[in-house]
Amino acid sequence: MHPVLRQMRPQQQAPSQQQPQKALLAP
């Protein structure tokens, strides 16, 4: 999946992967 979709839908990603994604979205 595209990186944009992964950021928009962090729920699909594993909890361990949600942390780095949120870190980029929420500084």
Swiss-Prot record:
A GO CC term assigned to this protein in UniProt: host cell nucleus
Ranges of Low complexity composition bias in the record: 7-21
UniProtKB keywords: Host nucleus, Late protein, Viral genome packaging, Viral release from host cell
Localization, UniProt: Host nucleus
Predominant localisation class: host cell
Induction field: Expressed in the early phase and late phase of the viral replicative cycle.
Residue numbers spanned by region Disordered: 1-27
Function of the molecule: Involved in viral genome packaging through its interaction with packaging proteins 1 and 2.
Sequence similarity: Belongs to the adenoviridae packaging protein 3 family.
Subunit details: Part of the genome packaging complex composed of packaging proteins 1, 2 and 3; this complex specifically binds to the packaging sequence on the left end of viral genomic DNA and performs packaging of the viral genome. Interacts with hexon-linking protein IIIa; this interaction is required to promote correct genome packaging.
Additional note from the record: All late proteins expressed from the major late promoter are produced by alternative splicing and alternative polyadenylation of the same gene giving rise to non-overlapping ORFs. A leader sequence is present in the N-terminus of all these mRNAs and is recognized by the viral shutoff protein to provide expression although conventional translation via ribosome scanning from the cap has been shut off in the host cell.
Name listed for the protein in its UniProt record: Packaging protein 3
Organism: Human adenovirus B serotype 7 (HAdV-7)
